[in-house]
Amino acid sequence: MTRQESYNFDELLLSGHGRLFGPGNPQLPAPQMLMFHRITQMSEEGGAYDKGQVIAELDLDPDLWFFRCHFPGDPVMPGCLGLDALWQLVGFYLGWIGGSGKGRALGCGEVKFSGQILPEHKKVTYEIAFKRVINRRLVMGIADGWVSVDGEQIYTAKDLKVGLFQDPGDLSRSQG
């Protein structure tokens, strides 16, 4: 597979069906949980720590599913969906660099919300800056992330962690 520096929506859907990085490799969720429409930049260099970065975008539409239910009469995109998008991008990057296994979010150090995403907004931009990538028997990415809406940064997340697991059940057993 040739690594690309950007991906359109149809290519991201291939990832959701396990056909972008091959069988047994990280997958993105299918719509409606896929929280971006395109990845505009991927690199193993760059970002705030010069250890890799990902930039992605979501086009907003007042008819998106979450605006209809969160909250009736006061629609706002749930902050947890923006956070999940950041984890999705960390996992996608791990597959992009050749990591294998099923991606699982492992946590984050700190999340701050300083704004909200409303139906009248046009575009959400997600940015990931990698701090550390382990690509051995354990595959794990640690990154900081930012969410902006129409050019204004409104969320920050520090120390996002995603791991790739050959058997995701191992994660449950190790915590029980």
Curated annotation (Swiss-Prot):
Q: Which GO terms describe its biological process?
A: unsaturated fatty acid biosynthetic process
The EC number(s) given in the record are 4.2.1.59, 5.3.3.14
Molecular function (GO) terms listed? (3R)-hydroxyacyl-[acyl-carrier-protein] dehydratase activity; trans-2-decenoyl-acyl-carrier-protein isomerase activity
Reactions that this protein is recorded to catalyse: a (3R)-hydroxyacyl-[ACP] = a (2E)-enoyl-[ACP] + H2O; (3R)-hydroxydecanoyl-[ACP] = (2E)-decenoyl-[ACP] + H2O; (2E)-decenoyl-[ACP] = (3Z)-decenoyl-[ACP]
Q: Name one Pfam family in it.
A: FabA
> Which InterPro entries does this entry report, sorted A to Z?
FabA, FabA_FabZ, HotDog_dom_sf
| Gene3D superfamilies tied to this protein | Hotdog Thioesterase (3.10.129.10)
**Annotated metabolic or biological route of this protein:** Lipid metabolism; fatty acid biosynthesis
Q: Where the protein is mainly located, per its record? A: cytoplasm
User: What is one GO cellular-component annotation here?
Assistant: cytoplasm
Q: Where is the active site?
A: H70
The places in or outside the cell where this protein is found are: Cytoplasm
Output the HAMAP family linked to this UniProt entry: FabA
Summary of the function given for this chain in its UniProt record: Necessary for the introduction of cis unsaturation into fatty acids. Catalyzes the dehydration of (3R)-3-hydroxydecanoyl-ACP to E-(2)-decenoyl-ACP and then its isomerization to Z-(3)-decenoyl-ACP. Can catalyze the dehydratase reaction for beta-hydroxyacyl-ACPs with saturated chain lengths up to 16:0, being most active on intermediate chain length.
Q: Which NCBIfam families match?
A: fabA, PRK05174.1
- Family assignment from sequence similarity: Belongs to the thioester dehydratase family. FabA subfamily.
Q: What is this protein called?
A: 3-hydroxydecanoyl-[acyl-carrier-protein] dehydratase
Q: What is the native source organism of this protein? A: Alkalilimnicola ehrlichii (strain ATCC BAA-1101 / DSM 17681 / MLHE-1)
